[in-house]
UniProtKB/Swiss-Prot annotation:
Its cofactor is Zn(2+). The gene is nrdR. Residues 49-139 form the ATP-cone domain. This is Transcriptional repressor NrdR. Coiled coil: none annotated.
């Protein structure tokens, strides 16, 4: 790492500690050339995979778009913003855990439905009706019956 004081290339690490609940490493460094000390913070670069849409196009993961879709389904439902944010964090964590550079949008849609089902069954049905393109009342009934038969997966 370059010294921010003299620009030399050679610095040494004097001390390293975990900070931010283990999410960052704080390093105390010293320049070999000028002797000045400085602190750096290191964090892992956590990149979310790109999405492969049903038509084959690819686009970057858009957290705001995901949040807006979930908020639309949860509109006027008794679910706190904290619970919504926790569900979003869980989806992002699961996407990172795949280790893939790209995932099908279908996978994300299923993750959203699973999270909404845990949050609020009415919101789940709302989202499912749009996501699965329900055409008539029979499709709503089938989904509601399935919801009643199968417990939500934690």
């Amino acid at each position: 790492m370059h010294c921010p004081f003299c620009g030399a290339n050679d610095t040494k690490v004097i001390d390293s500690r975990l900070v931010a609940e283990g999410e960052q490493v704080r390093r105390r460094r010293e320049c070999v050339a000028c002797g000045e000390r400085f602190t750096t913070f290191e964090t892992a670069e956590l990149v979310l995979p790109r999405l492969i849409k049903q038509d084959g196009t690819r686009q970057p993961f858009d957290e705001d778009k995901l949040r807006a879709g979930m908020q639309r389904a949860l509109e006027k439902r008794p679910v706190s913003i904290e619970r919504l944010e926790a569900a979003l964090a869980h989806i992002k964590s699961r996407l990172r855990a795949t280790g893939e550079r790209e995932v099908k949008s279908l996978v994300v849609g299923e993750m959203v439905m699973a999270e909404l089902r845990k949050l609020d069954e009415v919101a789940y049905i709302r989202f499912a009706s749009v996501y699965r393109r329900f055409q008539d009342l029979d499709e709503f009934r089938e989904e509601i019956d399935r919801l009643a038969r199968e417990p939500a997966k934690e």
